[in-house]
A protein has these predicted regions:
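Iron-sulfur cluster-binding electron-transfer modules in prokaryotic oxidoreductases
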Residues: 19-233
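Cysteine-centered iron-sulfur cluster-binding motifs in ferredoxin-type domains/subunits
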Residues: 1-17
Length: 233
């Protein structure tokens, strides 16, 4: 199955059939009976080992232009994915420093405001750290203390998609422990997939899996009056 568990079919179904939850349950059953697929094993290896992920990403920028060398010369895909046009278009150039290296783990805010946690996800951490940096610094500019634990890992969405229930439990426990050190009042994220996974809104999961409310950064900024501040400029 190529289902991404996006839930689009569920929202459009007049009978609200939980197709994403059914697909996820079937994948867990298949994995339990036959073991992980080849792709599932690769997903588990990457998302379950942060050190390996960092190592592979360091060399990915150099290898990216080679990913499409086997496309037939007659294929129109070469116009879109040729090595000459690939850089900066289809795959972003990997930055020299990831988000963990760009921002501190804790930023002290105003004493009368609570601590908010930041869950960046692998995309903002390793591919778009400049966006992740804004995710960290904007709440701080609003006076909040910001906790960005460097022990956090993958949200578990790839593991859920591959039917790897045990890895989901491992990642969830790791992330719970990572944020427990500062006990934030809520956790902010800018990744829709991470938010859905951590809020328990994907494939029939229920409840905030980290034990803390997870909020999209845009909703947080609106709730804190940023729209009114921008309108007044």
């Amino acid at each position: 199955s190529l289902c991404l568990l996006c839930g689009s079919c569920v929202t459009k179904c007049p009978n609200r059939v939980p197709t994403d939850a059914i697909v996820a349950a079937l994948r867990r059953q298949i994995t339990g009976e036959h073991g992980l697929s080849a792709i599932g094993k690769k997903v588990a290896t990457l998302t379950g080992h942060k050190t390996l992920m960092k190592t592979l990403l360091k060399g990915a920028d150099l290898l990216a232009p080679l990913l499409f060398t086997k496309i037939p010369e007659s294929s129109g895909l070469r116009l879109r994915f040729s090595p000459e046009t690939l850089k900066g278009r289809s795959l972003p150039p990997l930055p020299e420093r990831n988000l963990f290296a760009r921002v501190p783990e804790f930023l002290q805010g105003e004493p009368d405001k609570p601590v908010v946690g930041i869950f960046a996800g692998y995309g903002l951490t390793y591919l778009y750290p400049q966006i992740g940096e804004l995710l960290v610094r904007l709440p701080h500019r609003l006076g909040y203390s910001v906790f960005f634990p460097k022990a956090q890992g993958c949200c578990g969405m790839p593991a859920l998609s591959s039917g790897n229930a045990s890895l989901i439990d491992t990642l969830t426990q790791n992330n719970r422990q990572a944020f427990a050190a500062r006990q934030p009042s809520l956790i902010l994220t800018a990744c829709a997939s991470c938010q859905g996974m951590l809020k328990g809104e994907v494939a029939g999961r229920e409840g905030h899996v980290l034990g803390v409310e997870v909020v999209d950064i845009h909703q947080f900024l609106v709730d804190n009056g940023l729209a009114e501040q921008l309108a007044a400029l």
